[in-house]
Amino acid sequence: MPNKRTIDLLVESFDLSVRRKYEIKNPNGDVVTTLYFPPITRADRKKAQARANTTDGLEISTQMLCQIAEKEDGSKHFAPADAINLQREIPEKILNEIELFMFDLSNDETLDEAKKD
């Protein structure tokens, strides 16, 4: 049996269909909605950067949120045009918490630190 190519080994090793669940809660602790996030690929990052049409990390991360956040049934939670409303209407702290979860980062690491990686 011939050796598998490295790319084939890598693709077989990581399941992109596994999603992580994030519950958004209001100040009273009630769940407002639940977001599901698949693993982020480099292609996802490039697409979000192209949509944002900038190198600004905050713009890109909000576009990424709109692009990959899913409902339980797999449909999209947001349209690309929702990015501006998220930035204007949602408290920064809440948006940061969602985006840190989306990027699979701990709350100890800031978005700016994550964007340098």
PLM region spans:
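Short acidic-hydrophobic surface loop/beta-edge motif
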Residues: 18-30
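A short, compositionally biased
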Residues: 12-21, 63-64
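Short secondary-structure capping micro-motifs at structural edges
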Residues: 7-10, 20-22, 48-54
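Low-complexity intrinsically disordered segments
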Residues: 1-15
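Short, surface-exposed, charged amphipathic helix/loop patches that serve as local interaction elements
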Residues: 28-117
